[in-house]
Every structure is written in C-alpha cells, then in structure tokens.
Swiss-Prot record:
Gene3D superfamilies: YggU-like (3.30.1200.10). It comes from the Archaea. This is UPF0235 protein MTH_637. Signal peptide: none annotated. InterPro entries: DUF167 (IPR003746), YggU-like_sf (IPR036591).
Amino acid sequence: MITMDCLREVGDDLLVNIEVSPASGKFGIPSYNEWRKRIEVKIHSPPQKGKANREIIKEFSETFGRDVEIVSGQKSRQKTIRIQGMGRDLFLKLVSEKFGLEIP
C-alpha cells in the first residue's frame, strides 16, 4: 500500500521517492517500503556507468507516458524522480492498474 509520504506535487509535476534494486530481473514496482517511505523499484541493469539510471528513466517514461528525470540520488539506491505533467491521483491509479499495488 502506497502512502502519500513518498509523493509530492510540485506545480504540474510529481516527485516520487524510490528505492532501487538493480540487477533484479525485469522492471517492476512490487511494493512500498513503509520504513523508508519509498516505492521499491526493481530493474534489470546493474549500477554501473549510469546503466541503472538510464533504465529507470526509460522504464518510467514508457510506463507513465511522461518525461522523467532523476532529481536526487544519482549514485544512490535511494532516488527522487520527477515525472512531468503527472498528478498524484493519476500516478496512484496507473501504479495500481499496471503493478497491482494496493492504494489506500
């Protein structure tokens, strides 16, 4: 279940706090970490030479149909991404539909 602690609307954009598990198979958003207040994200790429960051940007852009950038945590597993033109409600709806996460 995703709580609002990991999501923040800034103008027309949405900031999302994520925790990345690199080299984990295919891309997915399997759960929400209550303690860290971050959405857990699995990606295929290893954390080498920016491969993981490029995959995060590509997969989020394709999944949500929006431009995405990493705004903090470029060299960390804990990152904050900006999804342009995405509101909180639409994000929660799409995550629920595409990844089956329970939304409060």
